[in-house]
Amino acid sequence: MSDAPPTRLAQLRSQLQKAAYAYYVLDAPFMEDAVYDQLYRELVALETAHPQLITPDSPTQRIGDQPATQFTSVKHNIPLYSLENAFDFGELTQWEQRWQRALAGEIPSDSGYVCELKIDGSAIALTYENGILVRGATRGDGVTGEEITQNLRTIRTIPLRLNLDNPPPLVEVRGEAFLPLETFEKINQEREKAGENLFANPRNAAAGTLRQLDSRIVAARKLDFFAYTLHLPESHNSPQLNSQWEALEFLKKMGFRVNPNRELCPNLTAVKNYFEKWDEGRKKLPYLTDGVVVKLNDFSLQAELGFTQKFPRWAIALKYAAEEAPTTVKDIIVNVGRTGAVTPMAVMEPVQLAGTTVQRATLHNEDRIKELDLRIGDTVVIRKAGEIIPEVLRVLVDLRPEATIPYEFPSHCPECNSALVRPPGEAVARCVNSSCPAILRGSLVHWAGRDALDIQGLGEKNVILLIEHGLVQSIADIYDLTSEQLQSLPRMGQKSAANLIQAIAHSKNQDYARVLYGLGIRFVGKVNAEILAQNFPTLEQLQKASFAQLQGVYGIGEEIAQSVVDWFRVDANQQLIEKLQQAGLTFAQTQTAQTQTAQTQANHQISGKTFVITGTLPTLKRTEAAEKIKAAGGKVTSSVSKNTDYLVAGDNAGSKLDKARQLGIQELNENQLLELLV
């Protein structure tokens, strides 16, 4: 039995959001690109088939995650877009057909493509003023990154001064910082001798190195850099570059290292030959590459095609197939998450896979184990495609040892021994004991997280200590902790205890939306929590809201509405709210915020007007546009009717646009909407 669409969508979103957080915020990625790509494509397919289940916090509705705060945040002068992925030549052909259809005029016969190896490292943006390097930053979310100029100055292949006699006043260079394989091996050997944790792969090592606060460590690790694009001012003495190939040659002239294995290909047949050559040849390269970047060479065509919300239309990444490897299953264990979800894992003999040592693989759920007929002792094939960690692809039954027995999924929670429950229509078994240590542990870590109450010092290690020493039995208990109690914990001194007490006290001042998110209501992400807080300004209003009222809020679907209703029906949750209120937590928008919102809405020209949003807008997500409309006093609905005042239409607007025109409803593009909202 496969997962029901709502359940699978929730799983996919959760997995992708965790991976994006680790990649963009922590710079500590644990998911290979091939894994993320496959998950993302499955999510897109499910949301296309079930558009009513799309939520505002879905990874498909956003560009990226926010940068970390340990370094100074900087806004990129020109956004760093992601690349669309193709996983076979059929998808590459479809991409070519799309951009050809998008060009209204005649396609030049000599347009051609530039093929470059996709380096598995960290994207970097460099800014030069009058030829001098003044800023270097990570990609971040594509709009905002982290300034790491001092660290980038240590990379010998990044020139501090451009090799030009009369440089332009401003030059933006983009490229990839990476760690050569030989250097990576030496670093890990040194870390092993020092008793330090080993880097999982060169990509992780490069990301971690760039975020070192001590640039001397960065210099010692000898990162490398390939430049792959640049942006020049249109005025002054800037050279007129007409193609990607010319840009790469000019980058070389300025003193940058560009990948020598690039190639100018006249057509997709040549692109295919290039890809196949390097699919085999990459194994001999001194660095890791996970695919080929294919770009239209002609800059005029690039300018005409432009960008989608996330990708340039004139470029695509053709990815290598995910790697597979055989290994032996030593054990099957189950983990319990903060929502009580029980996930089986295969513990395996260590095996190298795409530069990573793999010892565990997800088995998803009980049904997947039965489908595979997986048994302890089996030889299996695992791959890096489809989950946060590797998955078991198939069992090599012919290699099965004698006397193996089918695996019996546990009927009771391994953490608290409560009976597991598998809700009808769901593939995941759950522990429903709110006092389960695993659920409590996950709930506390979530509550203290950066996007929730942001309690500095209350990470997983300290949470485990608090639970093991019997100091907390619920989230609310942290507000009763004393400095003396904390100092009784291992490695918790007086200063650390005082800092944690202060951080816990400060969390009482966090806004209502953060508190809602911190409660960990199933399916309620950060964006959903903000929507709920805006539409139900007090917890009392939210608790009294019916399923229909919740579902009627733009951005809150059936699944979220039912989850909120169910959560408030649980006695233990009501007791938790009561304790948190007694502790002084905020369960309402401030009166000032409510008053300002009401005044703004009442005075605006769109107050009381009804909007429908459809298609892909150039810069705003639909949820962002909806929130701007509601903030000005307008209403947003999901369907077009005679009561609709405005239809906001982006690309691929579809049937809603047709119906609006039939009814004579006024159409707005994004710019017109923003003008109306002023």
UniProtKB/Swiss-Prot annotation:
The keyword Transcription does not apply. Its EC number is 6.5.1.2. GO terms for cellular component: cytosol. CDD domains: BRCT_DNA_ligase_like, LIGANc. GO terms for biological process: DNA repair; DNA replication. InterPro entries: BRCT_dom (IPR001357), BRCT_dom_sf (IPR036420), DisA/LigA_HHH (IPR041663), DNA_ligase (IPR001679), DNA_ligase_AS (IPR018239), DNAligase_adenylation (IPR013839), DNAligase_N (IPR013840), Hlx-hairpin-Hlx_DNA-bd_motif (IPR003583). NAD(+) binds at D33, A34, V35, Y36, D37, S82, L83, E116, R139, E176, K295, K319. Its cofactor is Mg(2+); Mn(2+). Keywords: DNA damage, DNA repair, DNA replication, Ligase, Magnesium, Manganese, Metal-binding, NAD, Zinc. Residues 601-678 form the BRCT domain. It comes from the Bacteria. It is an enzyme of class 6 (ligase). The keyword Cell division does not apply. Zn(2+) binds at C413, C416, C431, C436. GO terms for molecular function: DNA binding; DNA ligase (NAD+) activity; metal ion binding. The active site is at K118 (n6-amp-lysine intermediate). It catalyses: NAD(+) + (deoxyribonucleotide)n-3'-hydroxyl + 5'-phospho-(deoxyribonucleotide)m = (deoxyribonucleotide)n+m + AMP + beta-nicotinamide D-nucleotide. SUPFAM superfamilies: BRCT domain (SSF52113), DNA ligase/mRNA capping enzyme, catalytic domain (SSF56091), Nucleic acid-binding proteins (SSF50249), RuvA domain 2-like (SSF47781). Belongs to the NAD-dependent DNA ligase family. LigA subfamily. DNA ligase that catalyzes the formation of phosphodiester linkages between 5'-phosphoryl and 3'-hydroxyl groups in double-stranded DNA using NAD as a coenzyme and as the energy source for the reaction. It is essential for DNA replication and repair of damaged DNA. PANTHER family: CHROMOSOME TRANSMISSION FIDELITY FACTOR 18, DNA LIGASE. This is DNA ligase. The gene is ligA.
